Amino acid sequence: MKKINKIVLAVGGTGGHIIPALAARETFIHEDIEVLLLGKGLAHFLGDDSEVAYCDIPSGSPFSLRVNRMFSGAKQLYKGYVAALQKIRDFTPDLAIGFGSYHSLPAMLASIRSRIPLFLHEQNIVPGKVNKLFSRFAKGVGMSFAAAGEHFHCRAEEVFLPIRKLSEQIVFPGASPVICVVGGSQGAKILNDVVPKALARIRESYSNLYVHHIVGPKGDLQAVSQVYQDAGINHTVTAFDHNMLGVLQASDLVISRSGATMLNELLWVQVPAILIPYPGAYGHQEVNAKFFTHTVGGGTMILQKYLTEESLSKQVLLALDPATSENRRKAMLSAQQKKSFKSLYQFICESL
């Protein structure tokens, strides 16, 4: 097999796509491979990490049902394709890996045009349109969950990606229980509105309750904090947390959307969760949540249309019951031990 010296990662959009790509990058860097990220919206997730080589390129979705949006998306897609084609010609990679979302389209199209071997990584149990379509042109798909394999038209195998780094251990002295609330990388208004009020209802049952609430980039930090303050709940409210693993490890319960990255990290640290799937995006988060709650047994799911202060507070009290929490942690440990530990790099080497 020819030695792999350079890899392009086609990625962009939300954390569900970008965070796995950054994890894959770490794996390849460890193998002395030069990595270039091509996509849109990367800067927000990189923070001050100047070591990551990336280039923001235009992208647009050609999948809109509205004619004007479809043409606008196609125009941006073409601009991104031209830019990606030039970057790929300059970088001369040995292969490219797409991580889903229409933001990865320009770089994947440019890779195919340049006759560079293409691989995909799928984070969800139900793949999106882009990965399903491009699996016809790919040499292989590495999946976070084996159940996704039935949707692809090429070799597909469950692989392991390292989770986000622990920058420092987090401790909340005297706090018990600790609840982490996460609305996803884009935030979730309904979680920011309902969850604080629901947790205020259980304050009398848990005098030492501590809440770490990540509201997302558009969340109203002051409004969310005010609800906790009025209820006498010790708390931290932040827009984003670069030490997500540290927060999860310090938590007794997580209330979150059910993106694939979150599910992987929950399984890794074995922290039970109450999942409120995002109702859009072809329902993939609901499938993720059903897998986590029904197949794994790691928590409960509340569909957004049924999310109320009352329904959530009841589930929180159930989740914090010591026996329930312990059973869920054991179930998550069992599921994690059954997952594949073959790396994406190893899978690619076997497929070339």
From Swiss-Prot:
InterPro entries: GlcNAc_MurG, Glyco_trans_28_C, GlycoTrans_28_N
Pathway info: Cell wall biogenesis; peptidoglycan biosynthesis
Superkingdom per UniProt: Bacteria
GO MF term set: glycosyltransferase activity; UDP-N-acetyl-D-glucosamine:N-acetylmuramoyl-L-alanyl-D-glutamyl-meso-2,6-diaminopimelyl-D-alanyl-D-alanine-diphosphoundecaprenol 4-beta-N-acetylglucosaminlytransferase activity; undecaprenyldiphospho-muramoylpentapeptide beta-N-acetylglucosaminyltransferase activity
Chief location bin: membrane
One of the protein's GO biological processes: carbohydrate metabolic process
Keywords noted in UniProt: Cell cycle, Cell division, Cell inner membrane, Cell membrane, Cell shape, Cell wall biogenesis/degradation, Glycosyltransferase, Membrane, Peptidoglycan synthesis, Transferase
A single cellular component GO annotation: plasma membrane
Protein's UniProt keywords contain Cell inner membrane: yes
A matching Pfam family: Glyco_transf_28
EC assignment: 2.4.1.227
Plastid recorded as keyword: no
Enzyme class: transferase
Cell location: Cell inner membrane
Membrane topology listed for this record: Peripheral membrane protein
Catalyzed reactions: di-trans,octa-cis-undecaprenyl diphospho-N-acetyl-alpha-D-muramoyl-L-alanyl-D-glutamyl-meso-2,6-diaminopimeloyl-D-alanyl-D-alanine + UDP-N-acetyl-alpha-D-glucosamine = di-trans,octa-cis-undecaprenyl diphospho-[N-acetyl-alpha-D-glucosaminyl-(1->4)]-N-acetyl-alpha-D-muramoyl-L-alanyl-D-glutamyl-meso-2,6-diaminopimeloyl-D-alanyl-D-alanine + UDP + H(+)
Reported function: Cell wall formation. Catalyzes the transfer of a GlcNAc subunit on undecaprenyl-pyrophosphoryl-MurNAc-pentapeptide (lipid intermediate I) to form undecaprenyl-pyrophosphoryl-MurNAc-(pentapeptide)GlcNAc (lipid intermediate II).
Family, similarity comment: Belongs to the glycosyltransferase 28 family. MurG subfamily.
Name assigned to this protein: UDP-N-acetylglucosamine--N-acetylmuramyl-(pentapeptide) pyrophosphoryl-undecaprenol N-acetylglucosamine transferase
Gene (name only): murG
